[in-house]
UniProtKB/Swiss-Prot annotation:
Example of a GO biological process term: tRNA N1-guanine methylation
Subunit structure: Homodimer.
Family the entry assigns: Belongs to the RNA methyltransferase TrmD family.
Function: Specifically methylates guanosine-37 in various tRNAs.
Molecular function via GO: tRNA (guanine(37)-N1)-methyltransferase activity
Keywords for this protein: Cytoplasm, Methyltransferase, S-adenosyl-L-methionine, Transferase, tRNA processing
GO cellular component assignments: cytosol
Keyword Methyltransferase carried by entry: yes
Name of encoding gene: trmD
Catalytic reaction equation(s): guanosine(37) in tRNA + S-adenosyl-L-methionine = N(1)-methylguanosine(37) in tRNA + S-adenosyl-L-homocysteine + H(+)
Localization terms from the record: Cytoplasm
InterPro entries: Alpha/beta_knot_MTases, tRNA_m1G_MeTrfase_C_sf, tRNA_m1G_MeTrfase_TrmD, tRNA_m1G_MTases_N, tRNA_MeTrfase_TRMD/TRM10
Full protein name: tRNA (guanine-N(1)-)-methyltransferase
Provenance organism: Dictyoglomus thermophilum (strain ATCC 35947 / DSM 3960 / H-6-12)
Location, primary (coarse class): cytoplasm
Length: 245
């Protein structure tokens, strides 16, 4: 079972997201144990201070190293992965999520204010960012990591095929999805999906997934290993797009 410990100064932020849906079921069924810890519980002064002014001047407050060190030392096990959520970290992606889902123990440190004291880097194993934008703190990034990681644990999702067909699981975006009704406000479900021809449906889905990726995230096509069929489908897509102009 994976254990995830989250260190934060706002533990109340995690009450809702982890108490519903797949994350709650994963905890109830024993696939993961998630514990949220208030960083102030690891302080030693009467004011429970977790931040201070930066040396050298400047705006904002910096998170102090002492409580973070104490929290990590208290929670750390032999094979713990200690992660600092930070704008300067590695950009989080599906590959990292898969890697972390195979770990036994994760400790997530939620940064805050203008950052954390640089000496905290001494006790972490990696830094992770969820994107090139500014957030108030590391709490929301921690939630993103937990959600992405937990759903990859075998058995968490009811249908194992759901995982195989998701966007990014095979390096490209997912194909378009349709459900009932067959026709809605003049928009119809593609006829191929009603044909019952599973070979042609599979081909259509792969082609549309490649089309969506080519139009919206062409950078992904440079990273994924494409089959000969994929290359042929891409040529078809490019030809169709040229004809539309």
């Amino acid at each position: 079972m994976l254990r995830i410990d989250i260190i934060t100064i706002f533990p109340e932020m995690f009450r809702g997201p982890f108490d519903v849906s797949i994350l709650k079921k994963a905890q109830d069924r024993g696939f993961v144990e998630i514990k949220v810890h208030n960083l102030r519980d690891f302080t030693e002064d009467k004011h429970r201070t977790v931040d201070d002014y930066p040396y050298g001047g400047g705006s904002g407050m910096v998170m102090k190293p002492e409580p973070i060190f104490k929290a990590v030392k208290t929670l750390r096990k032999e094979k713990s992965e200690v992660i600092l959520l930070s704008p300067s970290g590695d950009l989080f992606n599906q590959k990292i999520a898969e890697e972390l889902s195979k770990k036994d123990h994760l400790i997530l440190i939620c940064g805050r204010y203008e950052g954390v004291d640089e000496r905290v880097k001494k006790i972490i194993t990696r830094e992770i960012s969820i994107g090139d934008y500014v957030l108030t703190g590391g709490e929301i990034p921690a939630m993103v990591l937990v959600d992405a990681i937990v759903r990859l644990i075998p058995g968490v999702l009811g249908d194992p095929n759901s995982l195989k067909e998701e966007s990014f699981q095979w390096g490209i975006l997912e194909y378009p999805q349709y459900t009932h009704p067959r026709e809605f406000e003049g928009m119809e479900v593609p006829e191929i999906l009603l044909s019952g021809n599973h070979k042609e449906i599979r081909r259509w889905r792969r082609k549309e997934a490649l089309r969506k990726t080519f139009l919206k995230r062409p950078d992904l096509l440079e990273k994924v290993e494409l089959t000969q069929e994929d290359l042929e489908l891409l040529e078809e897509i490019k030809k169709e797009l040229r004809e539309e102009v």
